[in-house]
Amino acid sequence: MQHNEEADGYDVVVLGSGAAGLCAALSAARSGARVGVFEKGELLGGTTCLSSAVAWLPNNRYAREAGIADSREGALAYLESLSHGMILPELAEAFVDTVPELLDWLDTTPLKMRLVAGYPDYHPERPGGMPEGGRSLEPELFSFIDLGRWEDKLVGVPRRMTVAETPIGGGTGHLPSEVQEQRERDRVEGLGRGMVAALLQGCLDEGVAVHTGERGVRLIQDESGRVTGVRFEGRGGLHDVRAEHGVVLATGGFEWDERLRRDFLRGPLAHPATVPTCTGDGLRMAMRVGAQLGNMREAWWAPVAVLPGQRANGAQAVQLVHRERTAPHSIMVNRHGRRFTNEATNYNALGGAFHHLDAHDFDYPNQPCWLIFDADHVEKYGAFGAAPGTEVPEWVVRADTLADLARRIEVPADALESTVAHWNEDVHRGHDSEYHRGESVYDGFVGDKDKYPGVESTLGPVARRPFHAVQIHSSTLGTKGGPRTDADGAVLDVDDRVIPGLFAAGNVMAAPTGMVYGGAGGTLGPALVFGYRAGRAAARTAGSPSEPDGILMEPTSV
């Protein structure tokens, strides 16, 4: 494909190449705009490539076709029940109301979605919640064959399956050898890289120019305050690119910038589970032109374990801790050797437990946190990459007694022994008397639901030696704060007025769902919706005839 590298720039300039950015670019191009996508990293796709690519999109037709009853009213009631006053109604309504239109539009692009059957909302017992699932969708498998030189320019490694084929989606996580070999020949992938590849293919088909190694450093404005371009830092140095109609920020969050984390987030965060390019570039650019900020204390919280000696995507490798804390025969304890939460709750809700501040000691008592599990857990479910019944990695702490394990992880032995004894008594009674683990439909979904349909899907005694421990860190899938926008993603200033020519979508914007993680895909659902809306709105915005500041140079491209 031939890139549109016109010296006078583009109608719409998009910063970032994750789901939000590529959806915005494709939407703008489909609306008739000349579009350029500029990615900070050398590879495309950002954190979307590392994800499962599940998108939480309520009131969708796939659920209705499967006989699942959902409604606009139910989805809005659900979000409101979790809002704590942090969700702006007009944004929630725009999100829910755009879902049918978005999915019809995606059907005309290379990205095709389908239902992840049975995946419940993360708070299914709340008003409007869906315990039977129906709101989480995933992309169909997509072939990379037609991507040409872009085929090997995506973040991450090939993953040739769908969520439905993994244990969380009801599958085994293993493909028959002949299926795996056929998918390798066809060069098809699912999950995050599959979603990015499909959106990228759509952009290339529409003539969108794609550039890597380009970090946005400043927005360019004319005398009236309209955003008319972007100053980039690339391999050739600083250069300016005109945006006749608008600029869409889709640069991700600020979780990799230590100072921004310190200044804005509500509690400690370590080892982000995202690409290291998420350092708040878009946030800083928006702040410089007077953007109003919102939701700055929040992130898409998630517990992780550090994988010693391993690196991924240019950073310390981590693993999201999901099944290990939800399957039977495991609990989590704080530095005092006490349980402090329902371990099987959704990963975002765990953030609140990690960030509890003790008013007397004025510290965070639940950090560090340790996952404690026994030999039965390892035998039945495996742990941290080890298959069921095999040896766990060498870095996992283990001991033949709880007292010795406590000594090794530096928690009080008497407290740990007492905690485990109380837990085992509760398991015998079939009820977690402290934190109600297993009572929500969601709790058991990631547990051993096939063998144990009730609370036993996540309850199991910690009794068989050897005992194991792994430190768990409060991490994130991205931050949720940034410039406030209207329903079309247009960025607002501190006086609630639109900053002409500036739009935002994805994790760089103030999340339209506030502190809520509605269900699986709670990040990518709004990213797709507001990327779609922002790209379309940017393409339809009248440009300014005035020249941007600085010297216009042809952007660097690979």
Label each residue range with its predicted role.
Residues 41-67, 77:
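Conserved N-terminal glycine-rich FAD pyrophosphate-binding loop of Rossmann-like flavoproteins
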Residues 360-466, 534-537, 541, 548-558:
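Helix-rich C-terminal "cap"/substrate-channel and partner-interaction subdomain
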Residues 12-37:
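N-terminal Rossmann-like FAD-binding beta1-loop-alpha1 element of flavoenzymes
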Residues 96-236, 258, 306, 420, ...:
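Conserved redox-cofactor binding core of oxidoreductases
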Residues 1-12, 30, 513, 517, ...:
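Extreme N-terminal leader/targeting segments of oxidoreductases
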Residues 132, 143-169, 173, 283, ...:
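An anion/pyrophosphate-binding glycine-rich loop and adjacent beta-alpha core
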Residues 184-193, 205, 234-310, 358, ...:
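Glycine-rich loop(s) and the adjacent beta-strand/alpha-helix scaffold that form part
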Residues 218, 226, 415-512, 516:
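A glycine-rich dinucleotide-binding beta-alpha-beta segment and adjacent secondary-structure elements
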